[in-house]
Structures are given as structure tokens and as C-alpha cells.
Swiss-Prot record:
Residues 1-81, 94-121, 263-305, 324-352 are annotated as: Disordered. This is Topoisomerase I damage affected protein 11. Residues 139-181 form a coiled coil. It is found in: Cytoplasm.
Amino acid sequence: MEHNASDAVGTRDAGWQTDMCHRTSGTAEQGGSKNKGRGGRREQSHIRAYSSASADGYRMHRNHTGGAESPGAEQGTPPRRNSVLKRRSLIQTIMSPEGGAASPERGRRSVSLYSPASAGSDEGDVGAMLQTLATRELALLEQRKTVEDLRRALRLEERVLVAQARELEELKQRVARALDAGSPRAVLEPGAELPGAPGARESVWAKSMSFLNEFDQILQEGLEKRLGFDELMPSPATDATTPEADDRRGIWGLVSEFKAGLLGLSDSTPPPDAPAAYLEKQRNRSVGPEPRRTNTGDAVAEHSRDARYARKRDLHEQAYSPADAAAENGVVTGGRLGATPHSSGSIRKRCPPLSTSVEMQNYV
């Protein structure tokens, strides 16, 4: 009976302790209503763990005492008060010293690190961190790949640019060579020489021009000798009568005659039966500044033309009689000298017959 009574009392005390735990958990839930979520669930699990621990401790105490009643029971006092005090002392560890509910921070610190809830939360945090790390590593790899692609494209562009610059330089050289070949009068720079050339070579045009100048000079000298200019103006070069000079005169005689015929200078040669006075007068009138030597025969032709006109005028004057004053003061009418009171006839009647003269033929 005693054991049955004690078991009944223990069962009743366990029920009361369970009610107290539920009340305490309700109070804790009301006090921590603001902290919802994972913190509130941890507090509830903490309170339940301690309530189950207190119930297990009471059962262990009953088994250790062998089901004996407390001293208060032997004295006739109800054992309920003593058991209530013991259970209250076990529950005070959950409550705050002031009698209020335990704070969320203390509950979190008292929870074991090896509890299933904390382990699950830690595993979730680590998984999220690993996922974030993997995402960032993938983004970093993509950025590195993009940078490598850009560098490769830059190298390709640089190679293309170098090739285009080389082609442009070659095109410029081709254009320069084409222009040089198209313009034969292009003069090279003094310092510019073709690679592989043995030395400075004269141009074909320069040789041709020098040859023509020399030939023209020789012809001019021959003409001057034929016209007698070197006799009027002696010089050391013309005074020296050497066999070479004679040979040159003989060689270039035909050439000078041919050129004189082309220029129309054959008319200026006096007839073989010309008097000495005519030649002397011609020499006196031809004395003057030496014609300028040029590469062409224009100056020589002009000088010879003036000399021919002067000789024609001399021949015309020579045809008059010095004693006839009327002929000098006559008036030209119709291309002839008219008769004057002191004249004894026409000029044509007193002129010597010069029909065989070339000068007279040109004059008429």
C-alpha cells in the first residue's frame, strides 16, 4: 500500500511538474513573442529538454531511496510540499534570478552546440556560403576568359595593322618607281644613288645635248672663218696656223657650206669678179660686236640677214656715179629715181650690167 501510495504521489508530482513546465514554456513563449523564428524554437526546445531532465531526476531519486517516504510523511505531514520545493529548485535554473523568463541570449548560450537544430542551421549556412563561393569563382573564370579573348583579338589586330603598313610602304615604292620611269627628265638627288650601281653614270640625254652643243660650236666657228670674222678680230686661237687648224678648216668646209645653204647664206658670198673696193667696204661695215654664240643658228642667221641687207645697200650706192649729184638728190617715184633738171637721164641707163650678179637678181 505504501508503494502504491508513493507511486501515486510520484505520478501526481510528475503530472504537476509537466504542468509547470508547460506553464513555464508558455510564459517563455509570451515573453519571447517578439523573437520569432529560429530563436523562439530554440528556447522551446531548451525548456522541454530541462523539463524532461527534471522529471528523470525525480524518478532516479525515487529509485535510489527505494520508494521510502520522506520524513515528513512519517511525521504525518504531506510529502507534497517537499517535492514541490525540490522541483521548484530544478526549474529555477530556467527562470531568471528576478523571477522573469530567461532571456533569448542566455537560452542561446545554454543550448548545446551538438543539438540537431543548431547542426542543421550551421549546415545550411555553410551550404549557402559554398554556393556563393562557387558562383563567384565561376564569374571570375568567365571574366578571365573574356580578358584572354580580348588579348588574343588585340594581338590579331596588331598583326593585321603591321601587314597593312608594310603593304602601304610597298605601294608607295611602286608608285615612286612608276613616276620615275614615266618622266625621263626627272633628275635624281645628288646624294641619292641606286643600290648596286657601280658609280655615277651620265644620262643619255646629257651626252646627246653635249654632242649637239659641240657640233653647233664647230659649225659656228667654221661659218665665222668662212665669213672672215676671225680675220677682222684676230685672237691667239685663230692666229695659230697649224696643220691641225688647216685640216679642221678643210674638213669642216663642206659642213659650213651645207649649213650656209640651208640658212640661205649662199646669197651673201660675193661674185668671183668682185672688185677689191667692194670687199674692203664689206669688211669695214661688218666690223662690230661679235654675235652671241648660242645652241641654235637664229642669231647667226639674223646677223647674216642684216649683213646681206647692208651689202645690197652698198651695191646700190656703188651703182651711182660719184660725180652725178642729181642722182644722189633724186626723188624715188614708182620704185625708180625720177629725172631732175640737172640729170641727164635715168639711173638704169648709167648702171653697169649686173644681171649676172646674185645680189642684183635679188634686188630686182
